A protein has these predicted regions:
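Active-site-proximal alpha-helix that buttresses catalytic centers in soluble enzyme cores
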Residues: 1-132
């Protein structure tokens, strides 16, 4: 049996609707490309679903592991303190075990997007688009 992975795409949240739209679109793109991955979204504040609601949205999906991925470019107080506290993980141990449908599920907390060639390529692409 292959492990079924869940990805919880985490956003900050905003009063402006396009913030939620972007997080939702990124989650949809992940789900379309990686078919055996269940993708849900959750927000730190100002938007629904909350992170807790996002985790609960995995109920009934059969995932055995969830990876919470902050869709933030770099570390800050939210990624180092607020989100880990909500998820029940620490800086030293970025994983925990949660219960979903009476089963143990491992929850991992990933690094933010960070410095990566894909981010650099996207920044260059946006620069070229600005000149069109």
């Amino acid at each position: 049996m292959t492990e079924k992975i869940g990805i919880l795409a985490l956003g900050h949240g905003s009063r402006l609707p396009y913030n939620k739209d972007v997080i939702s679109e990124v989650a949809d793109l992940i789900a379309e490309k990686y078919e055996n991955t269940v993708v849900r979204i959750g927000f730190m504040n100002m938007d629904d679903p909350t992170m807790d609601e996002g985790i609960k949205a995995f109920e009934g999906t059969g995932v055995t592991t969830i990876v919470a991925v902050p869709l933030f470019l770099a570390h800050g107080v939210h990624t180092t303190e607020d989100i880990p506290q909500i998820l029940g993980v620490s800086r030293e141990n970025r994983s925990t075990t949660i219960q979903l449908n009476g089963n143990d599920v491992t929850l991992f907390y990933s690094e933010p997007l960070g410095a990566d060639q894909l981010i650099a390529d996207l920044a260059y692409k946006r620069a070229m688009e600005a000149m069109e």
